[in-house]
Structures are given as structure tokens and as C-alpha cells.
Amino acid sequence: MSEFSIIQQYFNRPCQETDLGIGDDAALISVPQGYQLAISTDMLVSGTHFFPDTAANHIGWKAMAVNISDMAAMGAEAKWATLSIALPEANPAWLNQFSAGLFECAEQFGVSVIGGDTTRGPLNISLQIMGVIPRDQALTRHGAQLGDEIWH
């Protein structure tokens, strides 16, 4: 199965709030005036971040959720994500379950997958997330103060 057929069959969904979404060499987005773009990336490696026999839909959900959590921690609204995935093989059943979990989480939080990359290799998933936050309103680690609540 080719990279383009994997993208078309499992990851090509309508994109919200983009000027150009998935399917080209790059996506185009516009950030509203008065906002900043927040960007974060997390990688999940089979055998390190999840057991090799973990259900694919759970892996997809987790890949999106850990990134959305980073946006929330900064006070940003998650909007867009790009997915890079290395697969040992293009298993249609696994890809169907993985993409179902990924998009279930994405849709719950209003995130559009706007691009990415696929290649052959040991199972590795890297998701980059982008969001918006009103200018100079980011909640940074350096802004924490004695008495602030910490959630985990």
C-alpha cells in the first residue's frame, strides 16, 4: 500500500479553519489577529510508550490526547495536528483502528489533522499539534507560583 493510498484511505478528513489542508506538500493556516500560534510535539514508540499488543484505537487516541493535553497546559485551544508514522507493514485492520481512535479524540476536541508523513520502519508515531492562544496569555512553567493547583 503506497503512502498516498494510506493517507487517502485512513487520514483524509475535512479540515476545519485551514486555508489548505491535507494532501499537498504543506498545509496553510491563518492565525487570527491578536493570537499566537502554540506548537508542541510528542513521539510514541512501541515498547517504550505503549506495549506492542496495545489496541490500535487506544494508541491513536493516546497520540492525539497527549498533544491536546500540552495545548491545555499552556492555555491554548488545540486546532491542527500533523501526524508522522513509521509502520512495519501497512496492515489495513490496524490502520483502520488507529485512525478511528485518533480521529475520535481529535473530533472531541475540535482538532483537524492537516498533514503528515508515513514510512516503513519500527512502529513510531510522532504527532505535532498547533493551537491558538490570545497574545501574551500563555500559561508557562515559569509562571507557576506557590499555592497554584497542579493537576496530573
Residue ranges and their predicted role:
Residues 37, 44, 77-152:
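Glycine-rich anion-binding loops of enzyme active sites
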Residues 18-20, 52-66, 90-104:
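Glycine-rich anion/phosphate-binding loops
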Residues 23-25, 31-32, 46-54, 62, ...:
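Surface-exposed loop/turn and secondary-structure junction residues enriched for glycine/proline
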Residues 63-74, 105, 109:
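A short, N-terminal amphipathic alpha-helix
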Residues 1-55, 74, 79, 83, ...:
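Extreme N-terminal cap/leader segments of soluble proteins
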Residues 8-11, 68, 99:
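A generic alpha-helix structural signal
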